[in-house]
Amino acid sequence: MMLSSTSLYAAIDLGSNSFHMLVVREVAGSIQTLARIKRKVRLAAGLDNQNHLSQEAMERGWQCLKLFSERLQDIPLDQIRVVATATLRLASNADEFLRTATEILGCPIQVISGEEEARLIYHGVAHTTGGPEQRLVVDIGGGSTELVTGNGAQANILVSLSMGCVTWLERYFGDRHLAKENFERAELAAHEMIKPVAQRFREHGWQVCVGASGTVQALQEIMVAQGMDELITLAKLQQLKQRAIQCGKLEELEIPGLTLERALVFPSGLSILIAIFQELSIESMTLAGGALREGLVYGMLHLPVEQDIRRRTLRNLQRRYLLDTEQAKRVSCLADNFFLQVEKEWHLDGRCREFLQNACLIHEIGLSVDFKHAPQHAAYLIRNLDLPGFTPAQKLLLSALLQNQSDTIDLSLLNQQNALPADMAQHLCRLLRLAIIFSSRRRDDTLPAVRLRADNNALYVLVPQGWLEQHPYRAEALEQESHWQSYVQWPLLLEELS
């Protein structure tokens, strides 16, 4: 038992709104999540005007920790980290709570500063979130909000502000009314908090903004439920605020995709996020792959931050599912060659090129389940696996491409994903399918010099003179492919160069 437990790690975050526990296993330099346990303790709601933590709030916290403690018993002490954040930084009687909490858990609890919290959040994001290196990270907690800019693994500006979705709920939505005036007061107060640091952030700049909190997670769930793309914008936030105001009362707040669990602190979190967007002139935000707890875990593992998280994830998949990496590379190189030949005519961009490469590198993952229905197995795996660096919308696009890699084409899958415009996703699908057919001999010396020419939606495939006659298997596959593509109004025309 002890042998397997040495690869287990746990991170616990005693937050102002929720207590969280993450249990992972180290597998070949990456982490596999074994358990995520979250309990709404709402510790911050137990603070009075003198910052004294009520007995009831402490009891709620201790009850939760009793639950956590059993799960910790099989994990070595030096592979557990427990941190406490805003409320326990603030509470005048925090020592009383921490004394009992330490006895329950049987391991030390560290009350971390706002700056250290911001650093750990950034570290968690850097290990789990793909995209450009230069980023702004926003995390709205129950009692504090962290803003961090950084480049790759290095955090630059770290700020922790004393405002959170629980404290703002008690202060500005205490009457449980979702009135316009309550939102205005909450937003104004948030503006006042952010103003002193806003210019510093704006001057520093960033390429991408990611949100790492329950508020942002809730927004993502709302957008998925309503069939929107996953980019969070100020216009969408204002739209949701109007919807909340129409509901009138917190108890009657109903927005498709918003869970009951998240509803209570959603309006207060939304107010803070609107103010952050306005003060920092944020154009759009996406959801981060991880935050504080992931930062704690990766810190214990001492794993380096990869330059390209998505590539690391794909390499791990290739190893885990014993994929033929030579074949994946062969298909990938050919698909890239095809891409470069049609990118101008089809107005494809760098994002498209990366998605096509990613799909090629794992296109045979379904074979690890069974040859029969391999594309469906591949799509299922990609939809359901934890893929650090990939957002839910990106996973949906990848699974749509993999499900459509051969045989019948299901256009609805390509049209319903939101990571790329539908026509771009369709173009990538066509290139992937052709690259797979031409590479089917699994040898580099059998790849012909194929030329592609796109004319609107028509795709001309030009092969050397006599090639089709010399390669009857692939000639037949290409003939069948032209039929598959014609069924969805994708004209595919085969020609031999004279």
From Swiss-Prot:
<dbReference type="Pfam" id="PF21447">
    <property type="entry name" value="Ppx-GppA_III"/>
</dbReference>
<comment type="similarity">
    <text>Belongs to the GppA/Ppx family. GppA subfamily.</text>
</comment>
<keyword id="KW-0378">Hydrolase</keyword>
<dbReference type="GO" id="GO:0008894">
    <property type="term" value="F:guanosine-5'-triphosphate,3'-diphosphate diphosphatase activity"/>
</dbReference>
<dbReference type="GO" id="GO:0015974">
    <property type="term" value="P:guanosine pentaphosphate catabolic process"/>
</dbReference>
<dbReference type="GO" id="GO:0004309">
    <property type="term" value="F:exopolyphosphatase activity"/>
</dbReference>
<dbReference type="InterPro" id="IPR030673">
    <property type="entry name" value="PyroPPase_GppA_Ppx"/>
</dbReference>
<dbReference type="InterPro" id="IPR023709">
    <property type="entry name" value="Guo-5TP_3DP_PyrP"/>
</dbReference>
<dbReference type="InterPro" id="IPR003695">
    <property type="entry name" value="Ppx_GppA_N"/>
</dbReference>
<dbReference type="GO" id="GO:0015970">
    <property type="term" value="P:guanosine tetraphosphate biosynthetic process"/>
</dbReference>
<dbReference type="InterPro" id="IPR043129">
    <property type="entry name" value="ATPase_NBD"/>
</dbReference>
<dbReference type="Pfam" id="PF02541">
    <property type="entry name" value="Ppx-GppA"/>
</dbReference>
<comment type="pathway">
    <text>Purine metabolism; ppGpp biosynthesis; ppGpp from GTP: step 2/2.</text>
</comment>
<comment type="function">
    <text>Catalyzes the conversion of pppGpp to ppGpp. Guanosine pentaphosphate (pppGpp) is a cytoplasmic signaling molecule which together with ppGpp controls the 'stringent response', an adaptive process that allows bacteria to respond to amino acid starvation, resulting in the coordinated regulation of numerous cellular activities.</text>
</comment>
<protein>
    <recommendedName>
        <fullName>Guanosine-5'-triphosphate,3'-diphosphate pyrophosphatase</fullName>
        <ecNumber>3.6.1.40</ecNumber>
    </recommendedName>
</protein>
<dbReference type="InterPro" id="IPR022371">
    <property type="entry name" value="Exopolyphosphatase"/>
</dbReference>
<dbReference type="InterPro" id="IPR048950">
    <property type="entry name" value="Ppx_GppA_C"/>
</dbReference>
<dbReference type="GO" id="GO:0015949">
    <property type="term" value="P:nucleobase-containing small molecule interconversion"/>
</dbReference>
<dbReference type="InterPro" id="IPR050273">
    <property type="entry name" value="GppA/Ppx_hydrolase"/>
</dbReference>
